[in-house]
Design a protein with these regions (language model features):
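Sec-dependent bacterial lipoprotein signal peptides
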Residues: 1-18
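Extracellular/periplasmic metallocenter environments
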Residues: 20-23, 80-121
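N-terminal edge beta-strand
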Residues: 27-53
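Beta-strand-rich interaction surfaces with strong enrichment in secreted/lumenal proteins
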Residues: 46-48, 75-79, 89
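Short edge beta-strand/loop segments characteristic of extracellular beta-sandwich folds
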Residues: 55-61
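Short proline/glycine-enriched turn/loop motifs at strand-loop junctions of beta-rich domains
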Residues: 62-66
């Protein structure tokens, strides 16, 4: 057998089998849209559940006065103006429970507004 054949056969086989292995498909990342209503003196829904890794779009409205949408641990602090929608997007990277509060200080009832975001495994 010639040296060209000894070189050519392994080279051809290497390229032929290189395309046979397929990487497993990347896990599907979910994307969720959730409407949230802030009103005298409540946040609805009271609990929002999402899966770890999800791209979460919150569409927050208020039916009365200005509120603040604050989530400890997720670095979210957004004003929510009357009769407008505030869009908040975040990636749910870390499992756990996160408290949602109204960020308006000093107004009657604002400090009683609370909900929870739960990021599940």
């Amino acid at each position: 057998m010639s040296s060209k054949t000894l070189f050519a056969v392994p080279t051809i086989l290497t390229f032929a089998f290189a395309g046979c292995h397929k990487a497993p498909p990347a896990p599907a990342v979910s994307e969720v849209n959730i409407p949230v209503l802030m009103k005298q003196w409540d946040i609805l829904p009271h609990e929002i559940r999402v899966h770890k890794g999800a791209l979460v779009h919150l569409h927050v409205t208020t039916a009365d006065v200005q509120h603040g949408f604050d989530v400890r641990g997720l670095n979210i602090s957004e004003p929510v103006n009357p009769h407008q929608t505030t869009d908040i997007t975040f990636r749910a990277d870390t499992p756990g429970k996160y408290t949602v509060e109204c960020g308006i200080l000093g107004g009657r009832g604002h400090d009683d507004m609370e909900a929870t975001i739960v990021v599940e495994e």
